[in-house]
Amino acid sequence: SSDLFKESNHIEEIQGVYVPFWLYDGRMEARGAYKAEISESHREGDYIVTTTRHFDVARVGDADFVRVPVDGSSKMPDTHMDAIEPFDYSDLKPFSTAYLPGFLADRYDEDDKKCAARVLTRMKNSTAAALHDTLGGYTGVQTLSEQLDPRTLEPHYALLPVWMLHTRWREQDFLFAMNGQTGKLIGDLPVDKGRVAAWFAGISIPLMILTALIMLL
């Protein structure tokens, strides 16, 4: 239970961090060729008759992306940083030291070129999924070829607020991350995650009103 967790865990550190992120705008061009079929069955006397129609299908399109985030800190676990999305970028503000008290402000150690590989993978996966979504209505689809090419990619640098909690429970170390804007929590613990989230939020939410999303470029 969460009560047992609270009683038996030992908090090693809880810290608000402005994590460096690269926010990418981009466009992907997609082309695909497919073999598709529609099979229909009906009964004729004692027999089940199946009719299959075959189609050559082509798809061409563009996908536009706005502010796809990738954290630029090797010290932050990528899985945690990806999982606490989304952030509401309408709240982005110009840099001001007024937002920094009580938070660490980390600097990127992975530049936009290094992080581009990760964001392109995300964009390609999303574009491929959107392409496949247009292939509904068929009973079977075989991919013959797909080409997904980036046409533009523009990075922007921002600092986004994250709460990090390091704790030890039953001789194991656990790491939690919480979106400092929305309160979304990610972390692995073999107890009720909802109750742990409420407990963690009780510590940090009173300070969330002091945070902001900071746009640097």
Explain the meaning of each model-derived region.
Residues 160-189:
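Extended, hydrophilic extramembrane loops/domains of integral membrane proteins
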Residues 188-201:
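Juxtamembrane/start-of-transmembrane alpha-helix segments at the extracytoplasmic/lumenal side
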Residues 2-168:
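Charged, low-complexity helical/coil segments in non-catalytic cytosolic or luminal regions
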Residues 209-217:
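Juxtamembrane boundary at the C-terminal end of a transmembrane helix
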Residues 31-33, 172-173, 184, 194-195:
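Flexible loop/turn segments at secondary-structure boundaries
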